[in-house]
Amino acid sequence: MKYRDLRDFLALLEQRGELKRISLPIDPYLEMTEIADRTLRAGGPALLFENPKGYTMPVLCNLFGTPERVALGMGQESVNALRDVGKLLAFLKEPEPPKGFRDLLDKAPQFRQVLHMPTKRLNSAPCQEQIWQGEDVDLGRIPIMHCWPGDAAPLITWGLTVTRGPHKERQNLGIYRQQVLGKNKVIMRWLSHRGGALDFQEWTQQNPGQRFPVAVALGADPATILAAVTPVPDTLSEYAFAGLLRGSKTKVVKCASCDLDVPASAEIVLEGYLETGETATEGPYGDHTGYYNETDSFPVFTITHITQRRDALYHSTYTGRPPDEPAVMGEALNEVFVPILQKQFPEIVDFYLPPEGCSYRLAVVTIKKQYAGHAKRVMMGVWSFLRQFMYTKFVIVCDDDINARNWKDVIWAMTTRMDPARDTVLMENTPIDYLDFASPVSGLGSKMGMDATNKWPGETQREWGTPIEMDRTVRARVDAIWDQLAILNNGHES
């Protein structure tokens, strides 16, 4: 499925009954969050607030509020099909040369997809139909949501931040929230290991005293938005991966004020710079943990230009205790992670990040165990292989007879196959999300691995338990007469 832009995607959603237009005036201050939260928890549609109180620009919320809409945005008809996206990423991360002519034919579709990776730069674009600069720059024209009562200020949540480090051809796209400070200033909240922060750090080292160009695109096409939250290899641009998802080259246009490329079909683009040493205290904000986070200092983004479509809409979301939109996206992207991990660790059968664990703080892994100590190797692999799992605090490893996505199965394995002292690994002073106030020091905390697999010789001196299982012939006989027994036909069937 190909979408030319966000509006093309919205047209499809509306056709499928997955978009609700709200004409009643709704306030961006708290009311939109409450409506979007109730809708998401009920598995409801994307929401287009057509008449935000005090504004003429519509607000789009809850766009990726179900895993199915995430899959549609990535060009797939089902969540299960996202495994194919993961296989493509695994191939791009570590491409294998064909072993022969037949293997070359098998890999041909993957090589053909690579043709969509280069971007196509346009001379003019819809995102630059209107240009505001200088004193005319005013974020007050945009209905930026104030999500929670204790939030410090309105917050831009769905901005695709475009950066490029010195001597790099690849542009980085990342989604970092931005607190509004004034009509032309926001705080750029990015963590130190994220691509934008690394680009800025390298820039300040090589260009001391010079301004760092930045652009923020709002309302890009779904492939570009989702590419920015997908674990693409560090050497691959999110624009290139968006082209793979879309099946056509990503169309970009040069910024009005700098050499950065932005999505040509974006609804709104903020252009400007970061000044070395100019920082501000960000927060507090209600976050994906379900709590207000601590305040901290981050760079200030000064906006020199705002470009937009003539009839632009503003794409927004909120974060809160799961489920929220990031948690739903994490649930869908879980399917992308599995093939990537399996490429490195073929023994992995399934991998699950429960939404209740903030989508990254706890992982359950099932494996085909092959030797004593195998579970501990997998724990270390999860923590080290992908940057996305740097902050995963708990990893539970089970055998492949356990359903990683069924807590009844997992808890049974933990309580029958684990000895707390022998089967628990604790590591201190490891990187932790600074938003995790449970850690003793900001940015540093511990991790726990739990080996809930059956123990092999060398891991235990005791005779291991044999699972109970009914005789197969007996089960077959009872299957044959089960309906005739009619035991559960009086309202007791579960």
From Swiss-Prot:
Residues at the active site: D287 (proton donor)
Keyword list, A-Z: Cell membrane, Decarboxylase, Flavoprotein, FMN, Lyase, Manganese, Membrane, Metal-binding, Ubiquinone biosynthesis
Biological processes annotated in GO: ubiquinone biosynthetic process
Pfam families: UbiD, UbiD_C, UbiD_N
Enzyme Commission numbers on file: 4.1.1.98
Record membrane topology: Peripheral membrane protein
Pathway stated in the Swiss-Prot or TrEMBL entry: Cofactor biosynthesis; ubiquinone biosynthesis
NCBIfam families: PRK10922.1 (NF008175), UbiD family decarboxylase (TIGR00148)
Subunit structure: Homohexamer.
Protein name: 3-octaprenyl-4-hydroxybenzoate carboxy-lyase
Source species of the chain: Sodalis glossinidius (strain morsitans)
Encoding gene (name): ubiD
